[in-house]
């Protein structure tokens, strides 16, 4: 039987920052004591774009009492928690690569879910593998069977089945090659389809 996300040692969690409860730590401008505050509006065409063109404040002030909301910059996949009814996809992931982000830390607003690995960092192969799964029609259909609403729930994501470790890494390596082939500008629509990558790697 395939592992679930959680059984394989991964976990989707919801962004820690609820804005109205953290007003004193929300900032409009970058300062020495601030880090990026990521919102769902930072998810754009499969990537995290920061700063985004938005009317929302995008910085978070780090103090002793707010450090619990801070995450060290690392590879992850972000996922919008709320989607519009008319949107075609409930699962809208964004690949986040630590080496491509100019900050050592970040935090996330609670309209985002993101992936962690318990006790260690997520590897490049793993993060590309998860991005491919989340972008696939297979996972989209499966998730809709779990949840018919427009909300994407982290607890339900953690029950999703994933391939064995070696297969997940194979998926990730294939996606990495495709990403590199397409260059810097890539979206779910112009890369080899995620479902085709899964067919190649799983059969």
Residue ranges and their predicted role:
Residues 184-185, 203:
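Acidic, Ser/Thr-rich low-complexity intrinsically disordered segments
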Residues 1-181, 191-200:
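Polybasic, glycine- and aromatic-enriched phosphate-binding surface used to engage nucleic acids
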């Amino acid at each position: 039987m395939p592992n679930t996300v959680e059984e394989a040692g991964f976990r989707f969690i919801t962004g820690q920052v609820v804005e109205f409860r953290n007003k004193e730590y929300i900032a409009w401008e970058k300062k020495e004591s601030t880090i990026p505050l990521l919102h769902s509006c930072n998810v754009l065409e499969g990537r995290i774009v920061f700063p985004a063109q938005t009317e929302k404040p995008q910085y978070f002030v780090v103090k002793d009492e707010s450090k619990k909301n801070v995450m060290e910059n690392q590879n992850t996949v972000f996922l919008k928690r709320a989607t519009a009814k008319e949107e075609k996809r409930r699962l809208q992931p964004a690949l986040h690569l630590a080496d491509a982000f100019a900050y050592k830390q970040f935090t996330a607003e609670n309209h985002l879910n993101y992936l962690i690995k318990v006790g260690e960092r997520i590897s490049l192969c793993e993060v590309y593998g998860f991005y491919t799964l989340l972008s696939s029609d297979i996972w989209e259909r499966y998730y809709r069977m779990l949840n018919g609403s427009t909300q994407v729930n982290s607890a339900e994501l953690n029950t999703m089945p994933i391939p064995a470790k070696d297969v997940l890494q194979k998926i990730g390596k294939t996606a990495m090659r495709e990403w590199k082939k397409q260059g810097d500008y890539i979206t779910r629509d112009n890369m080899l389809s995620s479902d085709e990558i899964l067919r190649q790697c799983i059969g």
